[in-house]
Amino acid sequence: MATKLESFKVVEKLGVEKGEKGKMMSKKKNVKKDGDESESGFWFRFKFIFSCISSRSKVDSSMNATAVIAEPKKVIEKLEGHPAPTKDTGCAESGSSTPLMSGELKYSSKLRIFMFNDLKLATRNFRPESLLGEGGFGCVFKGWIEENGTAPVKPGTGLTVAVKTLNPDGLQGHKEWLAEINFLGNLVHPSLVKLVGYCMEEDQRLLVYEFMPRGSLENHLFRRTLPLPWSVRMKIALGAAKGLAFLHEEAEKPVIYRDFKTSNILLDGEYNAKLSDFGLAKDAPDEKKSHVSTRVMGTYGYAAPEYVMTGHLTTKSDVYSFGVVLLEILTGRRSVDKSRPNGEQNLVEWVRPHLLDKKRFYRLLDPRLEGHYSIKGAQKATQVAAQCLNRDSKARPKMSEVVEALKPLPNLKDFASSSSSFQTMQPVAKNGVRTQGGGFVSRNGPPMRSLSSLNLPQASPYRYARQSPKPKGKEP
C-alpha cells in the first residue's frame, strides 16, 4: 500500500488525469494540473479536507434512505455532429436523487451485510492512515474483518478488505451503488474482484471488497518508475481478457461491462488481473435484439466509435475498449494524452497505420522495455489489438477468441534484445548511435535494468490517493 506521503505526492503531481475523462466538471477546477506543484503537501491536504467537510455539511441530516447523486463524471464527450440519442432505455447512470427500496437489491446469499459501526472499527475509524484512495464513488479505506464474519478484527489479522464509502456529493451515486451490488454480488470468477458485502444503514452506503495489494494497472503503466516486465504485461492482458470473456459468453446472463480501462483492472499479489467497478455495467441484449440503446456513458478514449455516435451498445463495444487497453500495455502510453505532439495525442489514431506493419511495429512498443520483449509475442499482440479496434464492430473477435490468441504470449522467450536482426532494425541517429523502441540511447549509458516480476512496488488500488473526511456517523 502506498504510504500517506507518497499518495499525496501522486495527487499533487497528477491532478486531473489528462484526457481520460473527457470534459471534467467545474467542481474539479480546484484540482492541480499535471506538473503544478506550487503548493506544499500540507496546504494541499488542508484545502482538500476543508472542501470535503464543507460539501458534507450541505447534506440534509434529516435524509433517510436517500442517496444524493451528483452528475456522473463518466459521461462521454459527444462527437461533434453526432449527438448521442436522448432516449434512455434503463442505462446505469444517475441524474437525480433516487429513493432506496429494498426491492431494488437482488438477493445474493454470497454477500455479507455489515453494520456501519463494524466497518468504522474495521478501518480504524476511517483514519487517514487507512485511506487507499478516492474515485468517482467516494473514498476507499483499508480494513480488517473476520475471515467468515462481519466483525472487525485487529489490523494485520483476519481478512484484509477495501471499504468503499459513498460520498453524497460524489460523482457516482445510488444507481451505480446498486449496479455494483447486483452484478458483482451474483458474478463469481477469478478475473473479477470479489465483492464481500455491503452496508445500507440510514443514509450510509458502503461496499466491501477483497483487498488487491498490487493496485491498478494504470498505476503500474503510467505512475511507477520501474516498467512492468513483458511477461507480466501479457499475463495481465490475458487475465483481463478472461474477465470480459466470462461476462460476455459464460455468465448465466451476459453482461456488457461498459467501462473497461486500466484504472478498473486491479492486480493481486501475483499480478493476476481482476475487473472492478461495475457501476456502468448493463445486461447484454437477448438473442432477438442486436444491441442495447442507451445514453453514452464511459470514459473518453476507450469507448467504441459506433457507441459514441449512436448509443448502440453491444459486447463488441467492450472488445474495442480491450483493444485500447492492449495498446496502452504495449506502448506505455495513455489512450489520450494532450501533452504529446499533435498527431500522437490519440493513441488509437497514432498507432493504427503501423499495427500490421511487421517492419515498423516495434517502434510502437514501450521504450522502457529496452528490447526485453518477445518478438513473436509483440507481433501477435499488435495483431490482436488491430482486430479488436476494427471500425466494423461485427468484424471484431469474440473475447474467447482473444483469450486463445493471448494464452501463449506470457511464456515466449524470443527477446528482441538478444536478436541480431532486431539490432539491425533499429534506426540510426545522426551521431551513429542506434535507438531502441524509437528513443535514443547513450553510447555510455547505464546497462539494462533487471525487470524482475517479483520485486515491483505495491500500489494503491484506486485512482486518486487523497486524504478524505470520515463518513457520517456517531463516534463510538
Swiss-Prot record:
<feature type="modified residue" description="Phosphotyrosine">
    <location>
        <position position="209"/>
    </location>
</feature>
<dbReference type="GO" id="GO:0004674">
    <property type="term" value="F:protein serine/threonine kinase activity"/>
</dbReference>
<keyword id="KW-0418">Kinase</keyword>
<comment type="function">
    <text>Involved in chitin-triggered immune signaling and is required for reactive oxygen species (ROS) production. Acts downstream of SD129 in defense signaling triggered by the pathogen-associated molecular pattern (PAMP) 3-OH-C10:0, a medium-chain 3-hydroxy fatty acid.</text>
</comment>
<dbReference type="InterPro" id="IPR011009">
    <property type="entry name" value="Kinase-like_dom_sf"/>
</dbReference>
<dbReference type="InterPro" id="IPR017441">
    <property type="entry name" value="Protein_kinase_ATP_BS"/>
</dbReference>
<feature type="domain" description="Protein kinase">
    <location>
        <begin position="126"/>
        <end position="412"/>
    </location>
</feature>
<feature type="region of interest" description="Disordered">
    <location>
        <begin position="431"/>
        <end position="476"/>
    </location>
</feature>
<keyword id="KW-0808">Transferase</keyword>
<keyword id="KW-0723">Serine/threonine-protein kinase</keyword>
<dbReference type="GO" id="GO:0031663">
    <property type="term" value="P:lipopolysaccharide-mediated signaling pathway"/>
</dbReference>
<dbReference type="GO" id="GO:0005886">
    <property type="term" value="C:plasma membrane"/>
</dbReference>
<protein>
    <recommendedName>
        <fullName>Serine/threonine-protein kinase PBL36</fullName>
        <ecNumber>2.7.11.1</ecNumber>
    </recommendedName>
</protein>
<keyword id="KW-0449">Lipoprotein</keyword>
<feature type="active site" description="Proton acceptor">
    <location>
        <position position="259"/>
    </location>
</feature>
<dbReference type="Pfam" id="PF07714">
    <property type="entry name" value="PK_Tyr_Ser-Thr"/>
</dbReference>
<keyword id="KW-0611">Plant defense</keyword>
<feature type="modified residue" description="Phosphotyrosine">
    <location>
        <position position="307"/>
    </location>
</feature>
<feature type="modified residue" description="Phosphothreonine">
    <location>
        <position position="294"/>
    </location>
</feature>
<keyword id="KW-0547">Nucleotide-binding</keyword>
<feature type="binding site">
    <location>
        <begin position="132"/>
        <end position="140"/>
    </location>
    <ligand>
        <name>ATP</name>
    </ligand>
</feature>
<feature type="modified residue" description="Phosphothreonine">
    <location>
        <position position="299"/>
    </location>
</feature>
<dbReference type="InterPro" id="IPR000719">
    <property type="entry name" value="Prot_kinase_dom"/>
</dbReference>
<dbReference type="GO" id="GO:0005524">
    <property type="term" value="F:ATP binding"/>
</dbReference>
<dbReference type="GO" id="GO:0002221">
    <property type="term" value="P:pattern recognition receptor signaling pathway"/>
</dbReference>
<dbReference type="InterPro" id="IPR050823">
    <property type="entry name" value="Plant_Ser_Thr_Prot_Kinase"/>
</dbReference>
<comment type="similarity">
    <text>Belongs to the protein kinase superfamily. Ser/Thr protein kinase family.</text>
</comment>
<keyword id="KW-0067">ATP-binding</keyword>
<feature type="modified residue" description="Phosphoserine">
    <location>
        <position position="263"/>
    </location>
</feature>
<dbReference type="GO" id="GO:0006952">
    <property type="term" value="P:defense response"/>
</dbReference>
<dbReference type="InterPro" id="IPR001245">
    <property type="entry name" value="Ser-Thr/Tyr_kinase_cat_dom"/>
</dbReference>
<keyword id="KW-1003">Cell membrane</keyword>
<feature type="binding site">
    <location>
        <position position="164"/>
    </location>
    <ligand>
        <name>ATP</name>
    </ligand>
</feature>
<feature type="modified residue" description="Phosphoserine">
    <location>
        <position position="293"/>
    </location>
</feature>
<keyword id="KW-0597">Phosphoprotein</keyword>
<keyword id="KW-0472">Membrane</keyword>
<comment type="subunit">
    <text>Interacts with SD129.</text>
</comment>
<dbReference type="InterPro" id="IPR008271">
    <property type="entry name" value="Ser/Thr_kinase_AS"/>
</dbReference>
